[in-house]
Amino acid sequence: MLDAERAGAGASPEDVGEAGAGDAPTLPIALGGETGASAALKIGSAIAPAVLLAACGGGGGGSTPTPTASTPVVVTPAAITATQASRFLAQTTMGATRAMIDTVISRRYEGWIDDQFALPRATSHWDWLNANGYNVAANINSETGFDATMWRQMIVEPDQLRQRIGMALLDMLVVGIGGVNLNWKQFATAAYVDVLLDNAFGNYRTLMGAITTNAAMGSFLTFLGNRKANASTGAQPDENYARELMQLFTLGLYQLNMDGSVKTNGGTPLETYGPADVSGLARVFTGLSLASNVNTTPDRYRQPLVMNASINETGSATFLGTTVSGGGTAAVDKALDTIFAHPNIAPFVSKQLIQRLVTSNPSPAYVGRVASVFANNGSGTRGDLKAVIKAILLDTEARSDDALTGTTAGKLREPVMRLTAWARLAKINSASNAWAFGDTSSQSTRLAQSMGRSGSVFNFFRPGYAPPATGISNAGLVAPEFQITNEQSVVAYVNYMQGLVANGTGDMKPDYSDLTAKASDSAALVDEINLVLAAGQLSSATVTAIRAAVDSVATNATNAATNRVGIALLLTLASPDFLTQR
């Protein structure tokens, strides 16, 4: 956790204790004397907050000195260690595996990234839903199948960098299935996620066009079938998409320098746009409609929206200092070109991608280096996401071991990423293709997050969120993922993972064969879990505590290997060291 993040997330002093920024996290253990996997993994709700929030006392907000070069500072160590490889994979995949660690060591960082760029998508979400029979009349008003295809791709598909970037984009360019007011909504939302994944290594301008003509986005942000102004009734075009496209997807509320800092005039932030810009841009996004009226199959939700001239505004529209006229797709293209050319887009998008992959509080120099690559990939191309991804992941602030000790480095690991990290370690699969994790967005029983299920365009957490009245906010830092972190969600997470670690769910049973082979040696067992699951970030105190818990189960006890592995896994998953991605 960021040292400043140790102020907690809405926890009272009684919950978080007295731990300071320099204190090692404590791992209270109350496993009881029962035998069997489930019994050995019992951690009650009273313990969970202590496990996860014990290290959330006050903390300072210092900073780590960073290079000020205007171009990315690439770290190329003579040899990559297994720990460094695992840390890299924590930023670039949905979870490390032993095999991938070895591949990164062999191919090195940039070689591994290039290999991932070259991988085709094995199966689209849309095609998987079709192949598994979800395109039947019984599912016309259903979400059935959506969660299954999402979990499957995140956990087992080999294009792990694409999956990670796609989920980062879904956190930024939000569509949630519950707000998609279409039939066949599982197909419509799957088609949207496919757009993000298909364009994850493309150009951001192309991606802007693809989401603008996507049916699920059109429904979610209410511009599908948006009508031009009606002089008789006074009705005006829906402004939702025009506003969120600028505010959340491209530019932000305030004018930015290339390093992401806000431009001011006399101390007052300069706004990027005003109400007139929103109204003008909304006139452009009229007329976009479904390509077909056939609703007996989901096919029309995969097709790009088309222009319905009868409801499209063909008069002039002024926004961001530009005026377009004539309507149609030409006006849409010019509007998107205008936004894409705005100086804000490079730092705005770059900073959010850094936050999703590497650290919640990147230095201005880091943001500036990545933004410069967004603005120009070195060959005159703007918005080249491959170049931006490399700039983020190969920068010294991402790769240097110094980041491990910086007081503002790192981020709270998203709940979904915690589950997928365990699932990939445990070789989770579903022979039936049911992928029974389902919707995990419940704060009281699951993860408080489920990809593609945000209830709002503002996502489960905002990029600028800081827990109020904490060391984080006092230090001027942010911790987005803390917006869904509280006593209830912490307990729910530990309890949910307890069941999964012990038993899996449905036909998804964990394969711990690699770990049970080490179960009799607590040092070897915890070292392996520390490396693959936690990227070597468990402190010596945490390792000692987990080993003690493991050794409380005698090696000759009933189900000893299973119980020892389960204890080590659950306590790692519950430790602040794992919950922090550095």
Placement of each model-derived feature along the sequence:
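Sec-dependent bacterial lipoprotein signal peptides
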Residues: 1-9, 14, 18, 25-54
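Bacterial Sec-dependent N-terminal signal peptides
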Residues: 27, 31, 47-76
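N-terminal mature-domain "stem" immediately C-terminal to a signal peptide or N-terminal signal-anchor/transmembrane
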Residues: 74-122
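Flexible, low-complexity segments enriched for small/polar residues
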Residues: 86, 90-93, 134, 173, ...
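Active-site substrate-binding loop specific to GH73 endo-beta-N-acetylglucosaminidase modules
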Residues: 105-108, 117, 129-133, 143-151, ...
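Amphipathic interfacial helices
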Residues: 145-146, 156-164
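Short, contiguous, well-structured surface segments enriched in hydrophobic/aromatic residues
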Residues: 159-162, 173-178
